[in-house]
Amino acid sequence: MSSLTRLLQEKRKNETSNSSPRTSADTLTTTPESQSLDLHSRNKSSSHIGSVSNSSSSDRNRANVPVPGSVTTVTQIYSEEDSSSTAGSSLDDRNQFSSSFLNANFAHTASFYGTSAQSRDRFGSLINDQGTAGLSSHGGSFAAQNRITSRLSTTSHTSGRAIPSLSSSIPYSVPNSNKDNNSSNSNSSSLSSSWLETYAGGMPNNISAIDSNVISSPKVDSVEPRFVISKQKLQKASMDSNNANATQSRSISRSGSFSSQLGNFFFSKNSKESSNSNSAGMSFSANSNGPSPNIKNPNVTNGSTPIPKPIRARQSSIYSASRQPTGSYTDNFYGSPSSVHDHLPPSQSVPRSQHSSIGDLKRFFKKSSNSNLSSNSNNVIPNGSPLSSGIAVPSHSHSSSHFAAGNNSYSTSYNGNGDTIYSHSHGGSGIPFSKRYIKTGADLGAGAGGSVKLAQRISDNKIFAVKEFRTKFENESKRDYVKKITSEYCIGTTLNHPNIIETIEIVYENDRILQVMEYCEYDLFAIVMSNKMSYEEICCCFKQILTGVQYLHSIGLAHRDLKLDNCVINEKGIVKLIDFGAAVVFSYPFSKNLVEASGIVGSDPYLAPEVCIFAKYDPRPVDIWSSAIIFACMILKKFPWKIPKLRDNSFKLFCSGRDCDSLSSLVTRTPDPPSYDESHSTEKKKPESSSNNVSDPNNVNIGPQRLLHSLPEETQHIVGRMIDLAPACRGNIEEIMEDPWIRSIDMCHLVEDGLSFKVVRGEDHHHTQVDQSEAHIAGLEKKKKKQNNQ
């Protein structure tokens, strides 16, 4: 029995004989020699938690070094007692913790006292590296210093920790794996919790994190009749409200949501309005073609239209594939467009839009009979009855107008169906699109979403690509049509990356919606078809495509329609992705929920197999698959297969030799869990399969080697991961960019040079340039037709 244990027992006997009241801590005095005793033997013979503190100078307390000849106080805390210490106790109140508390809350205790230089024995004592207890009774200098150091290191580490991109924050999902919403929600909650524990170290432990941005409304079985408002009452109330506000100098309207503002960005329906207002300092110009306003009563739909799915745009031929460029431009909305009407007699009603601006800038515009008016004069604009959603309905013949405010310009147009469509441009001169741009007539391409033509800006003679969206189908609702256009435009204006096309503005003129984008001199498909690309040039273009995909995935977007047709390249060798009509959001910031995509979109040769098999799928591995097919096309100058279905013999051979008879089983495979012993995993033999498709690595005509053997050897590993039939087993974009071959590619890129960017070209290659007659898909189609006619 150690001397320290014997002293403790004697102290306990003395207290029992004296019949002293029970306290939570007892004090005894020991000699300095007792401090060198084995702590483990002491713990084995004692059921209490002991802590040692020196009563010498604070400097020696910080170093936790005993002073020769000094008196050391040993304090015990009974494990069966949770009450606080008495006034005569030598322990400070804030340092009195029972063993049950320490055992149950060791994680908190270790963090509080700092465990970087301390360990903990099995009875809960905090032991430092020198073998002495590290909890001070009074001064607590050493513990306090450890706490401060630990807190500072934690703070600095937290502040320097980078939030991960959304591309790798959620593991790849098996198609149709989120059938059970409850299990999905529980999994996402646990994932979100682990994410917060990893990347939100400064967050208190006693709060609950919000892991979803979706707030559900309460469900109501029935509505009492007294709460039901008819359309007539709603219209009458709106009319009365407008008449009451007629004497006010300014009116403020607010839309209910951001999506309604985007919808009103193009269309607004007005009914009769009559009120007086003062204009707010703007000039505008209008071009009218015989307006004959006949005001209609607003029509309100009772049911909400389901969110439309992207239209299937599948083309087996590369020449007829869709080419719908959109782009990237960081757009700041300073105001919301409002309808302006000219050339109307004062007795006729003029519709007025009733939606608010995103930048909370509300303005009224003056009615005038001239094309341009000063903002100093007051004009009367009759107002009608807006609907509760902020939509009003006009009905007159074709007319268009354009107005400017400061550095922003807006155009307002009307068609025969009573639609009001707005456009917003930055730094516009306040004149219509046809007077600011000249269409050269050269076609760049056409597809299901519209056609793309060249246009020259009159002010500086700069060339742009103008996409003219298709007209609304007869069986297509206006809501679906507007949603498709607004989503594509808003995605384009949100993106800002050198490898993403830039969107300049969107306007409406002559019943057609036009989107102005930056112009790139060549289509990547035309460059590939010229058969002049070197291997280094192909690698440069491939890495630039992957860089653009990495940017999209990092912000939670997936393209879903990657192909050679949707890649353009400028004369400086910078590749840019276009056409975001099929793009979807797969994840939102600070959320671990995966939003699965649905629908078959894209061109057949580039489609991933899960898109053709399952209704819902993770869109990220779809982009990875399509990127690999693009690389194979650039190398082989042909498609590996026409469509990823078993009826295609080439794809069937690609799926063969995998020890499985079902394509669905191959697609739904999951990655093997990591083995704790690599040597054991290599020695483990796989069970023999009874499948008819036995794998044969030496046969280059079946299995993945059917495609990989035609590619350069250094590319086979990473491309093989990108074309894995199972989307859950494919490499994510972060892993692909870290591949040694990808990292070794000398890619042309842009670097910031003051207020502009300069191109850093790759040293091992030059980018191919072709004649402009063959630089775009439209030119190749003309050449092909001419050859067929001959």
Swiss-Prot record:
GO biological process: negative regulation of endocytosis; regulation of sphingolipid biosynthetic process
Modified residues (Phosphotyrosine): Y334
Active site positions: D561
Disulfide links within the chain: none
Matches recorded under Pfam families: Pkinase (PF00069)
Stated regulation of activity: Dephosphorylation by SIT4 activates NPR1 kinase activity.
Effect in UniProt of substituting S357A: Abolishes autophosphorylation
Class of this enzyme: transferase
Domain Protein kinase intervals: 438-742
Residues with Phosphoserine modification: 47, 85, 90, 100, 111, 116, 125, 137, 141, 257, 259-260, 288, 292, 317, 320, 328, 336, 353, 356-357, 385
Similarity section: Belongs to the protein kinase superfamily. Ser/Thr protein kinase family.
Protein name from the UniProt record: Nitrogen permease reactivator protein
Organism of this sequence: Saccharomyces cerevisiae (strain ATCC 204508 / S288c)
Organism lineage: Eukaryota, Fungi, Dikarya, Ascomycota, Saccharomycotina
Gene that specifies this protein: NPR1
